[in-house]
Amino acid sequence: MKQFMTGMIIPLMLMASACGKTDPMPSDGRLTGVWVHETTGTDTIDFDELPSMAGEATFMLKRGTEVRNGLTLPKSGSGPYAYEIKGESIQVHWMLSSAFAPDPYAFKLSADGRSFRIGAFAPFVEGQTVHTFKKIK
């Protein structure tokens, strides 16, 4: 009887401990919401604005505007991107580029799913190679 009880308790404890651990990454690998750059406070990544294109996960990078040659234009790197998260890296392709191959960058979603760190795929802060974005919506 004692062996039976021990044999029942251990699996129950293992199941209970596994229930408390969840992966913040959605099972389909697609993020949602609007995320703001921790340092600039203005650069935003919006995962909800663009519809999926040909099955690809997409986001819109909004960097604001600047005046160039007397014209008010979007800041460099603004626009639509396709992405695919693979472990601790993200493949990013700027959809306004003539290049076909996506570029890999470091990527790490926080344990609580409220922020992520990503390699510098756009010129957010000069000299900074990894950037933190926090979810605001």
Q: Residues of each region from the PLM?
A:
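Sec-dependent signal peptide recognition
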Residues: K2-I9
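C-terminal motif of bacterial Sec signal peptides marking the signal peptidase cleavage site
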Residues: M15-A18
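Edge beta-strand at a domain terminus
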Residues: G20, P24, G77-Y83, G87, ...
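N-terminal helix-cap/turn-to-beta initiation motif at the start of protein domains
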Residues: G20-V36
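Short beta-strand segments that buttress and anchor functional surface loops
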Residues: W35-H37, I90-S97, R117-F121
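Short, surface-exposed coil-to-beta transition loops
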Residues: T40-D46, P74-G79, F100-Y105, E126-V130
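N-terminal glycine/threonine-rich, aromatic-flanked beta-hairpin/loop signature
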Residues: T42-Q91, M95
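An anionic, turn-rich surface loop/hairpin at beta-sheet edges
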Residues: S89-L109
